[in-house]
Amino acid sequence: MSVELWQQCVELLRDELPAQQFNTWIRPLQVEAEGDELRVYAPNRFVLDWVNEKYLGRLLELLGENGSGIAPALSLLIGSRRSSAPRAAPNAPVSAAVAASLAQTQAHKTAPAAAVEPVAVAAAEPVLVETSSRDSFDAMAEPAAAPPSGGRAEQRTVQVEGALKHTSYLNRTFTFDTFVEGKSNQLARAAAWQVADNPKHGYNPLFLYGGVGLGKTHLMHAVGNHLLKKNPNAKVVYLHSERFVADMVKALQLNAINEFKRFYRSVDALLIDDIQFFARKERSQEEFFHTFNALLEGGQQVILTSDRYPKEIEGLEERLKSRFGWGLTVAVEPPELETRVAILMKKADQAKVELPHDAAFFIAQRIRSNVRELEGALKRVIAHSHFMGRDITIELIRESLKDLLALQDKLVSVDNIQRTVAEYYKIKISDLLSKRRSRSVARPRQVAMALSKELTNHSLPEIGDMFGGRDHTTVLHACRKINELKESDADIREDYKNLLRTLTT
């Protein structure tokens, strides 16, 4: 059986799955042909078990349909083709969220050939393989006293003898306790906690990606703060990628590149934000490539963030993209309504402000793009409340966020939703308003109605009237139907998510 057949079937499966599922579970798989048998390699036990349970049956069907029609011989193994260095499922306890949703991982370091034992497809025993670790993290096995609080951000200088001095800022308020968890960030939070609590057995590198203001930086700081809580002597360095570039340029100017290398390669944990700024900076990428390799070979933790999936960063060398996939890559999605409400309630509680639940719900319904804008809106409301000497009510919120709400209403109108949905499904707006019931029109119409209910303040009768004079029960049925399909139909779920993102950003 050929590898080409496998690739053909994987492409067919790509069309059936949401992009995030495909990138998380199928993309990391490697394959090689051994006679009539296909050997499929998963990077670790979790990916293997998940693929076995969720996708193996469909893959075998596709292989049979597109091959000889006979069920193929296929083995699932842990490792990588051509015997890459051994990788392991961690010894430490793994949260259910991580176990259920491990992201784009590939085999770790290249090393002398090591045999990869086949794993029975239905097996579930833990697989333990050697991993290297850094002795300085051994001290984290027992909790230590937390470092003294220093306001919002702690100025913490980490110095290596004979090397550059670099001051790293960890925001002491960005902790796991202050992070509001929801469906959109559950996996990212679980993975970050695993790294923070078990630095010798976590995922390296941990790569978090997603839009602006979704909590990636918060989680990165939370990991750093937790590492320092467990071991105040740990050398934890947080910086923006532009700081790395600036340090390198300065080192070159001072003829101190060796000191620069010594500093960055001696830390216990390196946390770099917005890695996409390395794009098209060839010398910076070259230096970071070697720094990254040195850190992982020493068992030192690396955490990176970006505004997009690493493979999609243009101007970034392929070898870096490949290495970023060695560990765990996790998407952070925009928060859903319930999470937005929880964030507002928590922020109000931290500010010792009474925020009625209906007021939080009102703000959360209208500010949808990211957490940063949500917090900014709440700060405006609180300030307005203090200045006016009034309690926070929906009326006060309307006054304090008047310009912002007007902009949101302008951006997200039923007309705009209809136009966006029609363009997405390549139909006419008149089709959405017509009486046609063919699936190619009826389903987009239901999607548009559901989006109108979620994104606007119109009542069901008003929405129905704007969709060709339909009854409010038709709109209610459409909303319920789309909510059901989002749970069972991958295509509808992906369509809805794409349209929601387009309409709210």
Curated annotation (Swiss-Prot):
| Chain intervals for the UniProt region annotation (Domain II) | 91-168
Where is region (Domain III, AAA+ region) located? 169-385
Report the record's Gene Ontology biological process terms. DNA replication initiation; regulation of DNA replication
Region Domain I, interacts with DnaA modulators: which residues?
1-90
- Report the InterPro entries cross-referenced here: AAA+_ATPase, Chromosome_initiator_DnaA, Chromosome_initiator_DnaA-like, Chromosome_initiator_DnaA_CS, DnaA_C, DnaA_dom, DnaA_N_dom, DnaA_N_sf
Please give the SMART domains that the UniProt record associates with this protein. Answer: AAA, Bac_DnaA_C
Cross-referenced Pfam families: Bac_DnaA (PF00308), Bac_DnaA_C (PF08299), DnaA_N (PF11638)
Q: Name one GO cellular component term.
A: cytoplasm
Q: Which domain of life is it from?
A: Bacteria
Its annotated compartments are:
Cytoplasm
**Keywords linked to the UniProt accession:** ATP-binding, Cytoplasm, DNA replication, DNA-binding, Lipid-binding, Nucleotide-binding
- Binding annotation for ATP: 213, 215-217
Q: Which GO terms describe its molecular function?
A: ATP binding; ATP hydrolysis activity; DNA replication origin binding; lipid binding
Main location, first listed in the record: cytoplasm
Query: What's this chain's function?
Result: Plays an essential role in the initiation and regulation of chromosomal replication. ATP-DnaA binds to the origin of replication (oriC) to initiate formation of the DNA replication initiation complex once per cell cycle. Binds the DnaA box (a 9 base pair repeat at the origin) and separates the double-stranded (ds)DNA. Forms a right-handed helical filament on oriC DNA; dsDNA binds to the exterior of the filament while single-stranded (ss)DNA is stabiized in the filament's interior.
Question: What does the record note on quaternary structure?
Answer: Oligomerizes as a right-handed, spiral filament on DNA at oriC.
Q: What is known of its domains?
A: Domain I is involved in oligomerization and binding regulators, domain II is flexibile and of varying length in different bacteria, domain III forms the AAA+ region, while domain IV binds dsDNA.
Annotated protein name in UniProt: Chromosomal replication initiator protein DnaA
Starting at the broadest rank, the lineage of the source organism is: Bacteria, Pseudomonadati, Pseudomonadota, Gammaproteobacteria, Pseudomonadales
